[in-house]
C-alpha cells in the first residue's frame, strides 16, 4: 500500500465534513463570546446535518436558532455574529458559508473536498470500511432455529438479515462474532423424541395402535427420520413398548430409552442439515453454542443461585424457584401475558425459573445464555435477531440482565416481521416438489442465492416482506441484485474498452478530480461521499437494508452519469478524472456485494 493509499484508510468524508462544520461553528461561537459580539453563555446543543436540497448548502446548522434563548438575540443576528467570527478557512474543506432565512447557516464544500472523495474511493479498495466501532466486541445471534425440523422462510429472512447486520458492524470497525444457539435441551427435545418414538412404533404396529398425540410434531420429516432409524435398528424396541396404555407407555422406562436412542440418532442429523443449508446460504458462524452445555456445566443453576442471592428470586411453597419478572421488566415495556382460568389475559408477574421437580425452565437457560455472552465472554453488546412473535420476551430478557447485575441496555433485540412468498401475484405456501410447507432447502433449489440474500435484505426488519419468486429468478433490471451487478459489470467493460483503445488509467494520485463539475458527476460524487457513513448508520440502527437501497441508488446514479458524460473521446485530463470516478463507484459496489456475500461479475 502506497503512502497515498494509506491517506484514505478508514476514510469517511461525510462524517469528516460534519465534524469540521461543528468544530468551525463551535470555534466561531467561542470567539464571538470572547469578543463581546455575543453574551457569555453555555454553548447550546445544535444540529449539523445534510440538507435535502443542495441549494441550501452541503451542510446546514440550526445553531443560531438553538442559541436564541441563551444569547438573547434574534437568530439572524446570532448567525451574522458567528459568520464574522469564523476561523480562517484557507485549509478548510468549506468554500463558503452563508446565512439563510431566519438564521440557518449553510456551509458549501469546496471542489477540492469533492475531488478528495473521488480519489479516496478510487485509491482505497476497501472504501466504506471505517474504525468507527473501535474494535468493540459485538455478538450477533441469528436464525437459531430449533433442530427439531427444517428451516422455514422466517429463518431465510433472519439468516440474510443477521449475516448482513454482522457484515455492516464488521465494516464499521466492530469485532463481530456470528453465533447460532442450538436448542438441544428442554421441552422441545423431549417433544422431538416423543414424536420420533411414536412414528417408529407406528411403522411396526400401525397408527391405530400408537396414535400420534396432537402436541407432537406432525411433519413428514419426523416419519422419515423414524423410518431411517427403524431400517438400521429393526424392531428391537417394539416388544417392550407393546401392550401398555398410552399413559403407561409414555411414563415407561422402555419408551424413555427409545426416545433417547432416536434423539441420539436424529438430532445430529438435523443439526448437520442445518449447518449444510446455512453454509449453502453463505452463512458461516464463528460459534455454534449448545444449550445443553449450560445445563451440563452447571451454568444454569449458578445463574439461578446468583438471582436468589440478589433477591430477584424466591422459593415458592411447592419448592419452585420464582423470578420477580415484572419488577425488572417494567422499564423495558410489556412482558409476556398469561391466561387466567376464565380465559382472559393478565400480565405475568412472577415466573418459574426452576420447577418444583427441580428441572429448570427454558427461561432460566436463556438467562444463563445471555449472562454467558455479556459476563463470561465479555461482549459489549449481545444482539439477537428474533421473529416479531417473540416481542413479549424482550422486556423480560433485558430486565433479567439488570436483575443479575448486568445492563439490560447491552442486550439489543432486532424484531423481524413475517415473510410472504408470492408467485404470479398470489401467496405460495406449499412446495411443488414436496407438497409440504416451503423450507429453506426448497427455496435455495429454486432461487439463486444472490437473489435470496439481496431480496430478503431489501426492507428493514420491522416491515413485512412479500418475496416475489418470479422477480428473484429474473436476469434483467426488474431484479434489484441483477441491476446492481450489471452496473459493476458495465464499469469493468468500460475500463477494458478504454485499455483496448490504449487509454491507461494513470493512478488516483495523478488525477485532477476537481475537473468533475457536471451535475450528474456531482450527484455521483455526493453519493460516494455518503457511502462510509451509510454503513456506519446501518450498523448503528441495526438496519443493513439501507445499504441495499443505497447501492441501488448508486447504480442508478452511475447509469445517469454514463449517459450524460462522455469518457471515450473526452479531454485527456477529464477522461482520467472520469475513469477515477468509475473506479470509485466500482469499488463501492464491489464492497457492498462482497460484504453481503453476493457474487460480483465482471461481465454479464
Please annotate each region the language model reported.
Residues 116-121:
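Short, charged, solvent-exposed linker or helix-capping segments at domain edges/interfaces
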Residues 2-115, 129-604:
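Non-catalytic interaction-recognition regions
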Amino acid at each position: 500500500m502506497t503512502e497515498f493509499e494509506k491517506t484514505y484508510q478508514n476514510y469517511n468524508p461525510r462524517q469528516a465534513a460534519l465534524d469540521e462544520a461543528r468544530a468551525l461553528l463551535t470555534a466561531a461561537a467561542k470567539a464571538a463570546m470572547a469578543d463581546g459580539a455575543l453574551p457569555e453563555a453555555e454553548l447550546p446543543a445544535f444540529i449539523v446535518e445534510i440538507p435535502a436540497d443542495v441549494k441550501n448548502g452541503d451542510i446546514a446548522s440550526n445553531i443560531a436558532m438553538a442559541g436564541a434563548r441563551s444569547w438573547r438575540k434574534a437568530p439572524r443576528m446570532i448567525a451574522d455574529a458567528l459568520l464574522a467570527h469564523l476561523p480562517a478557512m484557507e485549509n478548510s474543506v468549506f468554500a463558503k458559508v452563508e446565512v439563510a432565512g431566519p438564521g440557518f447557516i449553510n456551509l458549501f464544500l469546496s471542489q477540492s473536498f469533492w475531488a478528495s472523495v473521488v480519489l479516496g474511493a478510487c485509491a482505497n479498495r476497501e472504501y466504506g470500511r471505517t474504525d468507527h466501532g473501535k474494535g468493540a466486541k459485538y455478538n450477533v445471534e441469528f436464525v437459531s432455529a430449533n433442530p427439531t425440523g427444517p428451516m422455514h422462510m422466517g429463518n431465510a429472512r433472519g439468516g440474510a438479515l443477521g449475516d448482513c447486520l454482522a457484515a455492516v458492524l464488521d465494516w464499521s470497525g466492530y469485532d463481530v462474532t456470528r453465533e447460532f444457539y442450538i436448542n438441544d435441551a428442554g421441552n422441545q427435545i423431549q417433544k422431538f423424541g416423543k414424536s420420533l418414538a411414536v412414528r417408529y412404533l407406528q411403522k411396526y404396529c400401525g397408527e391405530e395402535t400408537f396414535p400420534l398425540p396432537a402436541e407432537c410434531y406432525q411433519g413428514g420429516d419426523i416419519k422419515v427420520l423414524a423410518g431411517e432409524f427403524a431400517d438400521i435398528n429393526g424392531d428391537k424396541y417394539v416388544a417392550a413398548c407393546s401392550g401398555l396404555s398410552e399413559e403407561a407407555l409414555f411414563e415407561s422406562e422402555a419408551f424413555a430409552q427409545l426416545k433417547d436412542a432416536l434423539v441420539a440418532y436424529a438430532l445430529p442429523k438435523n443439526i448437520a442439515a442445518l449447518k449444510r443449508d446455512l453454509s449453502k446460504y453463505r452463512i458461516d458462524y464463528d460459534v455454534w453454542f449448545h444449550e445443553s452445555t449450560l445445563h451440563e456445566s452447571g451454568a444454569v443453576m449458578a445463574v439461578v443461585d446468583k438471582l436468589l442471592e440478589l433477591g430477584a428470586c424466591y422459593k415458592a411453597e411447592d419448592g419452585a424457584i420464582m423470578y420477580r419478572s415484572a419488577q425488572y421488566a417494567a422499564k423495558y415495556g410489556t412482558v409476556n401475558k398469561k391466561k387466567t382460568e376464565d380465559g382472559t389475559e393478565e400480565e405475568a408477574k412472577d415466573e418459574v425459573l426452576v420447577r418444583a421437580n427441580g428441572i429448570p425452565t427454558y427461561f432460566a437457560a436463556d438467562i444463563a445464555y445471555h449472562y454467558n455472552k455479556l459476563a463470561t465472554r465479555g461482549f459489549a453488546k449481545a444482539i439477537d435477531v428474533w421473529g416479531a412473535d417473540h416481542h413479549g420476551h424482550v422486556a423480560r430478557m433485558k430486565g433479567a440482565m439488570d436483575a443479575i447485575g448486568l445492563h439490560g441496555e447491552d442486550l439489543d433485540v432486532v424484531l423481524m416481521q413475517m415473510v410472504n412468498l408470492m408467485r404470479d401475484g398470489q401467496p405460495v405456501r406449499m412446495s411443488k416438489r414436496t407438497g409440504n410447507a416451503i423450507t429453506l432447502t426448497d427455496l435455495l433449489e429454486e432461487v439463486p442465492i444472490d437473489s435470496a440474500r439481496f431480496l430478503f435484505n431489501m426492507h428493514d426488519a420491522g416491515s413485512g416482506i412479500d418475496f416475489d419468486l418470479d422477480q428473484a429468478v429474473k436476469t434483467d433490471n426488474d431484479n434489484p441484485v441483477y441491476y446492481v451487478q450489471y452496473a459493476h459489470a458495465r464499469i469493468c467493460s468500460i475500463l477494458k474498452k478504454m485499455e483496448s483503445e490504449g487509454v491507461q488509467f494513470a493512478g488516483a494520485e495523478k488525477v485532477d478530480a476537481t475537473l468533475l463539475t457536471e451535475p450528474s458527476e456531482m450527484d455521483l460524487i455526493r453519493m460516494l461521499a455518503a457511502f462510509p457513513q451509510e454503513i456506519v448508520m446501518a450498523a448503528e440502527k441495526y438496519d443493513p437494508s439501507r445499504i441495499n437501497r443505497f447501492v441501488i441508488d448508486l447504480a442508478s446514479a452511475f447509469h445517469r452519469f454514463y449517459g450524460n458524460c462522455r469518457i471515450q473521446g473526452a479531454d485527456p485530463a477529464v477522461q482520467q478524472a472520469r475513469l477515477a470516478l468509475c473506479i470509485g463507484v466500482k469499488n463501492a459496489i464491489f464492497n457492498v456485494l462482497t460484504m453481503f456475500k453476493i457474487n460480483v461479475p465482471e461481465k454479464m
